[in-house]
Amino acid sequence: MKDNISGFTLKPLSATRWESRVDSVKAIRFQMQDIREALLEVSDTDNDAAICTEAKSLATNELGDFEFIVAIVIWYEVLSAINLVSKQLQAKDMLIDIAVEKVQGLISFFTKYRETSFPNILESAKEIAREMDVEPTFRTKRKIKRKRQFDETPEDESIASQSTEESIRINYFLSIVDQAIASLTKRFEQYQGTKKLLVFCLLQRNYVP
């Protein structure tokens, strides 16, 4: 399958290195059409029926699904932003003051990103979908009717019946970005604590009774 795909290399996902995570998603983000065509070719030519079925399913139900394309665009943008700062923080000469500023800047970026970027993400995903001849719309999911509980309000019901697009924005996009912000805030607080400790140690060292 790799022989059918040029440019970026498909890589297994690393659980430890941000750059590896970005590279893995980047390969899919920018070669989705090539990957899909390669999977379809495998489904038509491989002698193993199980492999043919799996390849066809991946090409049709994953890469041929607009929701999957949106998810890949989201992950690529989020991981790229984190990886850029992560690489800067790994510099041997990185000062704690600069590290604090870098993390604080990334938190500010994601705070704005969560409020303004979803429409742009959809446009990027639609462009990819059109190139792949994939319908740039979300599949309608079957709604499960249930009785309203005694403690539920009409507002609760409206949330339950929100559109697929809004559901993905709230339950997927915002969830990912909010997790990133929470993790970065924790890192920021750790750096702030280290900075205060260093200042205290310097003051103690320079203190002459």
Residues covered by each model-derived region:
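Alpha-helical structural modules in large enzymes and assemblies
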Residues: 1-209
